[in-house]
């Protein structure tokens, strides 16, 4: 008999069938994996078989092929794929287990056995009795192993049995291991203490047993970092044993900071606030919990924190709006601006960040809210950034909102000049951005004669003149503008209407429909400046 057959029969066979299988295995494979029958019996929770094998000399401290000893096999999370059943039964067992909100994964064994018997919907009293018997059976197996000499503090790999039991919130198993001398001052490979394992289980009874033997203050940093894992009862327990909810770790962060760093933390935050958490506490970087919420783009959490009194105007290395912009949550950005309209005039960095993130929706939101499209408080203007970072759609958007194409940055370069000096750039996007800029440049030069004396304009024209492709497109723009200027709309040219419709408002108001139709009739050969004209038509017909 091979190991797989022996494993399967442990779950389905009678005592006699299993012992016959073990006898066959011992005669054929005993020298290779001497204690394998004991490991299988433990993992399948066959107390009767475990007791028989221990009496016959099987080693309670032996390890299996995964380097786990007998106590570890009994206390570690159960792997349902070890059960000799098909996927349909496995899926049922997992679904039923989750529906009961159970914490001990080994309960999958009796659930599966009941399913194989055809009892997939046991009554509540029957199910409760079944669980109680199974749990008692597990404890009896552990007691047998310990009485036959299993060492509670021994391991070759993995977690100690006490840590597995504490992490599962298995209070009875924890008590049994402690009674046999299990140590509480060791740590896991992840530096978790026994106390951390216990509180993560959210079983207050288990945590209390460990806390009586261990100083929780040794784990204060880890407790804060994992605060989002604890339910209301566990949080109350931590407060009762002395945890100050405003305690800071080495980074200056509190429990509220860490809670706001995680997803689905609304309820945790509400619980923390019950115990007097400082809503505007700053860490060593000057960041508040609201900064954390905005960093992860959590609109619901941000609203909750502000309801509790979080200061949206708090000054630090980054504003909450900066972080919200980087998160990409348009609704959060909109909400913060509504809460603090001063962001529009004081937070010049957010527009640059939105451009860096290439988030056209947030760029549009900030521009429509009134943020300065020509802000020069950074090294470069927003238009410089848009061109250099290679996003022609954002470049067009900035130009449509009045970006100054002749602006000079701190290095003395215009957007066109700066972008065309770059080597590491998306040339397809640069090509489109160049055309947008030249289109606006040529249009402006037609009606603003003073612009020709502007140093930025001179620089731009120099860049265009020395590049054959750019010069060619400029000439195309000039030709199309000549055509637009030749189109007569009443006593005005179409170009004069586009360039200065404020001067002819009365004429436009009286002849709106006629003007619109006349323009539409002449759109056929207009390509480069078609968007200008369509925008003009929309504007006069509002």
From Swiss-Prot:
Keywords linked to the UniProt accession: ANK repeat, Repeat
* Top-level taxonomic group: Viruses
Organism phylogeny: Viruses, Varidnaviria, Bamfordvirae, Nucleocytoviricota, Pokkesviricetes
User: By its UniProt entry, which Pfam families does this protein fall under?
Assistant: Ank, Ank_2
Residue ranges annotated as transmembrane are: none
State the species of origin.
Fowlpox virus (strain NVSL) (FPV)
InterPro entries of this UniProt entry? Ankyrin_rpt (IPR002110), Ankyrin_rpt-contain_sf (IPR036770)
Q: ANK repeats span which residues?
A: 33-62, 157-186, 218-247, 251-281, 285-314, 316-345, 347-375, 378-407
SUPFAM superfamilies listed in its UniProt record: Ankyrin repeat (SSF48403)
Q: Which positions carry the signal peptide feature in this UniProt record?
A: none
Does the keyword Repeat belong to this entry?
yes
Specify whether Repeat is a keyword of the entry.
yes
Q: Which PROSITE patterns match?
A: ANK_REP_REGION, ANK_REPEAT
Protein name per the record? Putative ankyrin repeat protein FPV115
